[in-house]
């Protein structure tokens, strides 16, 4: 499958696919003319990359997860779920503040919804 076909299939831009290749995250085979080609194994790897990106994993961590058979995926996923849960709670707090402001039609002096210290602390500890 060409890079253009892979882009259409996945909805990922050609530029992103080229970037993943450059990083060594998604190496492509090359034709004699230098065109990138992806086989089924590469597309499966791309599917995993996209999953981990949706879960907000950094690209360097995704490469480690995919390239190291001894990497503890369960632990990484558990930590990422915890981080996403904290972010979800933060967003829910912001939504509630917006609803409160909308209903009251006036300003309130609340700042706890802007506090990301729990997220920052968890991110620091998880590394």
Where are the regions that the model predicts?
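Short, charged amphipathic alpha-helical surface segments
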Residues: 50, 62-124
């Amino acid at each position: 499958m060409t890079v253009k076909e892979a882009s259409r299939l996945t909805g990922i831009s050609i530029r992103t696919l080229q970037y993943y290749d450059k990083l060594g995250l998604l190496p492509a085979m090359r034709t004699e003319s230098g065109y990138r080609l992806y086989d089924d194994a590469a597309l499966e790897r791309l599917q995993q990359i996209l999953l981990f990106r949706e879960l907000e994993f950094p690209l360097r961590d995704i490469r480690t997860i995919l390239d190291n058979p001894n990497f503890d995926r369960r632990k990484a996923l558990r930590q990422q779920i915890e981080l996403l849960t904290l972010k979800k709670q933060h967003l829910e707090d912001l939504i509630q503040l917006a609803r409160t402001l909308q209903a009251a039609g006036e300003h309130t002096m609340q700042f706890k919804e802007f506090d990301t210290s729990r997220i920052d602390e968890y991110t620091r500890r998880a590394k």
